[in-house]
Structure formats: structure tokens, C-alpha cells
Amino acid sequence: MKVVDTEFVISAVSEKQYPKDDLPEFALAGRSNVGKSSLINTIVNRRKLARTSQQPGKTQTLNFYKVNNELYLVDVPGYGYAKVSKKQRAAFGEMIQDYLETRADLKGLILLVDARHDPTADDINMFNYALYLDIPILVVATKMDKLKKMEASQIKQKIGKSLDLKQENVSFLPFSSVSKLNVDKFWDWIEDKM
């Protein structure tokens, strides 16, 4: 897919705020600071469309980005950040759960995991939850540029120990925002699910 136009549309916290134009949507989930905003900026070739931060927990709403007037990428709040209150964490969880369970336009979940670390308990829970909801999943191993060649060659096996990548509705993609590794394959997956 050639990206010619991308725009931030809305930050939403409830269904009444979601876009109403029935375009396919793809949610990006992962722990805080896993690289969701960097991935968005890289795949649409815009440096500052999605705000990146060194401070975890910045995204606190569902952020809808329209691509080519054909689809939405939906950046959801990162999970696992300890400095967010339990009350806020519960609210984020409820907002994400409502979105994943009720949004008819949702065509896939892009689950980002940091290639340098094993998937967290939260990653495993999100993965299993999407499987339960029968949502197609693309597991994206971010920050591949930070791995040594030997580590990079074994990344699918490493992540596959925690996440069942052999499930029918699951795909896997190593990714780097620095080297732009697999941007085309990312869009191939999106187009296949539309």
C-alpha cells in the first residue's frame, strides 16, 4: 500500500466519539514505550504524526489516524506502566475492552512486543484475549535494530515460547522504526485483512 494521505482524526474515550464512516480499523496495542507511536510514524512516513515520548503512559485515549481515506489505525493506551493509578489503569482497561468487544469495524489487532525482552504477562493476556474474541492478530517485534544478528535470527522462536504464533489467525513480523524493516510486509497484512 502506498500511503499518500494520513491524518489524526480524534482522541476518543467512548463509542459515541468513534468515527462514524465505517472504514476498517486496526488497533495497535502493547506495553507503554514499546514503540506504537514510532511504528505509526514510520509506516505512514510522517515524522511527527503520532506524538512519541520518552515518558511511558502518555497515550491515555484511543487515537484514530485515517490513512488514505481507506482505514484507521487506532493507537490504544499502553499497558503495564506502574506510575498510573489503579483507578486510571482500570479505566484504560475498560475503554480498551469495550472497543475490542463491540467495534464492528475492527479488522485486526497489531500487538507490539519489544524484541529485546520476553513478552510480559500483559502481552500474553492481550494476545489470548484477542484470540478469544477471534480478532486477527499481527504480533510485531519492535526495536529489532537493537538486537545482535544472532538474537534477531531467533526472535520468532523466542517470542513463540510465550505467544502461540502457530494459531490460524496469527501472523508475526519483526520490525524496526530505525531501519524501516518490514514496512511493506506490515501493509501487506493490513490489505489482506481489509
UniProtKB/Swiss-Prot annotation:
InterPro entries in UniProt: G_ENGB_dom (IPR030393), GTP-bd (IPR006073), GTP-bd_ribosome_bio_YsxC (IPR019987), P-loop_NTPase (IPR027417), Small_GTP-bd (IPR005225)
Using the record's annotation, list all stretches that form the EngB-type G domain.
Answer: 22-194
Domain of life, per UniProt, equals Bacteria
Q: Which UniProt keywords apply?
A: Cell cycle, Cell division, GTP-binding, Magnesium, Metal-binding, Nucleotide-binding, Septation
Example of a GO biological process term:
division septum assembly
Could you say which cofactors this protein requires? Mg(2+)
Residues the record lists as binding Mg(2+) = S37, T59
The family database entries (SUPFAM superfamilies) matched by this protein are listed as: P-loop containing nucleoside triphosphate hydrolases
What is one Pfam family matched by this protein? MMR_HSR1
What are the recorded GO MF terms, alphabetically?
A: GTP binding; metal ion binding
Q: Where does GTP bind?
A: 30-37, 57-61, 75-78, 142-145, 175-177
Q: GO cellular-component terms in the record?
A: cytosol
Record family assignment: Belongs to the TRAFAC class TrmE-Era-EngA-EngB-Septin-like GTPase superfamily. EngB GTPase family.
Q: What PANTHER family would the database entry show?
A: ENGB-TYPE G DOMAIN-CONTAINING PROTEIN, MSS1/TRME-RELATED GTP-BINDING PROTEIN
Q: What is this protein called?
A: Probable GTP-binding protein EngB
